Amino acid sequence: MAYENIIYEKQDNIAVITFNRPEAMNALNIKTRAEFTEAARDVEDDDTIKVLILTGSGKSFVAGSDIKEFHATTSFMAHNIVRLGSIVEKLSKPVIAAVNGFCLGGGCEIAMACDLIIASEKAKFGQPEINLGIIPGGGGTQ
């Protein structure tokens, strides 16, 4: 399947999902979440895949949720932040986060759910939602 907000590649026994919204710092919108969920399901179902690598295009791994969608989808977004981390945690295959820049909010939650994080010297991790009076939704502070 062709995706719009992620790049999903398989080579040999390795799958790579690249969050691909560099103009939005790879912020997670509804479409990106749905595409990621579908690709992760394919990774789980494909017996030839032995490991999954998650990364981001441009200057970010994932800069959290797309706050432009908060006004209409607050409860949906909160549920799906948890769900993305749960999807990563429940995969039966090892998941590596290759963090190449900003890894914030929901992106940090996704990375923390991985089995291994490899971070470049430019990687920056954080939970900026606390500055908005919002508790990190994916459980990263619990």
Locate predicted features.
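Conserved CoA-thioester-binding segment of acyl-CoA-metabolizing enzymes
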Residues: 1-57
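A short, glycine- and basic residue-enriched loop/turn
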Residues: 22-25, 59, 64, 102, ...
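Hydrophobic alpha-helical membrane-association signature
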Residues: 32-35, 80, 110
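CoA-thioester-processing core
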Residues: 84-90, 98, 104-142
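Hydrophobic/aromatic residues within transmembrane alpha-helices
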Residues: 17, 54, 66, 110-112
